[in-house]
Structures are given as structure tokens and as C-alpha cells.
Amino acid sequence: MKTYKFPVVVEQDEDGVYIGLVPDLKGCHTQAKTLSALDRRLKEAIALCLQVERRGFHQNKFVGLRQVEMTV
């Protein structure tokens, strides 16, 4: 077995629901009402996404996140 560390983007919507997005895995995301539930669901979602992407999976090096603010 191989151990992976995935960066996860966590956002909170207008209803207070947490949304977790895994940029390294196409289409891999989940949501939950609490952060602890989100962590559990993220592990489940990542495991499922890895099963799908097992053949061509390449993990990029995580550099960081930025928040860009602009007025248009």
C-alpha cells in the first residue's frame, strides 16, 4: 500500500455546509454539516476516486493556496 497526502480546499456555503474539493483527483468532492464529518467523507471520496484513477494517477506537488479579491 502507498500513503498519499492530498491537499483539500474547504469552503462553507450560505447554509453552513462544508464542501471539500480534492484538486489532484478530477471530480473528487464531498460535503458535510461538520468538519469532522467532512474529514470522514473526504477519505471515503478519495478512496473511491483512487479506484477510478488507479492507472493514470500522478500526484502533483502541493505549493499553496491563494485567495484573489477583485472588484468587477
Name each model-derived stretch.
Residues 22-25, 43:
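ATP/adenylate-binding site constellation spanning eukaryotic-like Ser/Thr protein kinases
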Residues 6, 18, 28-30:
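Structural detector for hydrophobic anchor residues on beta-strands
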Residues 26-36:
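A short, exposed loop/beta-hairpin motif centered on an aromatic-Gly-Thr core
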Residues 1-7, 11, 36, 40-72:
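Short, charged, surface-exposed hinge/linker loops at domain edges
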Residues 11-22:
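Short aromatic-glycine-(Arg/Gly/Cys) micro-motifs in beta-strand/loop hairpins
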